[in-house]
Swiss-Prot record:
It comes from Methanococcoides burtonii (strain DSM 6242 / NBRC 107633 / OCM 468 / ACE-M). The gene is tmk. Coiled coil: none annotated. CDD domains: TMPK. GO terms for biological process: dTDP biosynthetic process; dTTP biosynthetic process; dUDP biosynthetic process. It catalyses: dTMP + ATP = dTDP + ADP. This is Probable thymidylate kinase. The keyword Nucleotide-binding applies. InterPro entries: P-loop_NTPase, Thymidylate_kin-like_dom, Thymidylate_kinase.
């Protein structure tokens, strides 16, 4: 039986990591493979260094994309072929949404171009949970975690959120948009319902 790929997306501070920890500790997902992007590989390390620096935006995209390709070939594809459930905290949609903003001064339709260079080799998720929140609230949350990255700025996150919602509108069969500015128990309930429905389908 072929496995499933479930991805968690959203702007920084939207609550993805909190939900990932919840799922990781839930008995229903004891046999699931939990992963994230950027990865912990040497390519992922290069991505983290780029995030903390003033690396050229196009070079940064290529690092993210290389990490994604390696992630698919070394972990995601083998796990899916073994029939496992894979849950990834960030995936290709993060690139479409974020670099679609950072590259808007470099090209006319950056998000479409980034999607094009992924076409034919990336694995499309069976389900993408998009955690949606007002960027101002998200930045406040990020500030409470300590030092902020260059991506954790309100103006940038407004554009990223718009890109995410455009992606969700184009693929309603794949995306489930979840409002995360509410009680955590309600969010967890909606997440479990969405994942259970896709696993049982």
């Amino acid at each position: 039986m072929k496995g499933k790929l479930i991805t968690l997306e959203g702007i920084d501070g939207s609550g993805k990591s909190t939900i990932t920890r919840f799922l990781n500790s839930h008995p229903a997902f004891a046999n699931a493979v939990f992963t994230k992007e950027p990865t912990t590989s040497w390519i992922g390390d290069a991505v983290y260094k780029a995030i903390q620096s003033d690396t050229d935006e196009l070079a940064e995209l290529m690092l993210f994309t290389a990490d994604h390709a390696d992630h698919i070939s070394t972990l995601i594809r083998p796990a899916i072929e073994e029939g496992k459930i894979v849950i990834s905290d960030r995936y290709s949609d993060s690139r479409y949404a974020y670099q679609g903003v950072t590259l808007k001064e470099r090209m006319e339709e950056p998000m479409e171009w980034i999607q094009m260079i992924h076409r034919g080799w990336t694995i499309i998720p069976d389900l993408t949970l998009l955690f949606d929140i007002d960027p101002a609230v998200a930045v406040q949350r990020c500030g409470k975690r300590g030092e902020q990255t260059k991506f954790e700025k309100t103006d940038l996150l407004k554009g990223v959120r718009e890109n995410y919602l455009k992606l969700a509108e184009k693929e309603p069969e794949r995306f489930v948009v979840i409002d995360t500015d509410r009680d955590l128990k309600e969010i967890e309930k909606d997440v479990l319902q969405a994942i259970t429905s896709i696993i049982e389908s």
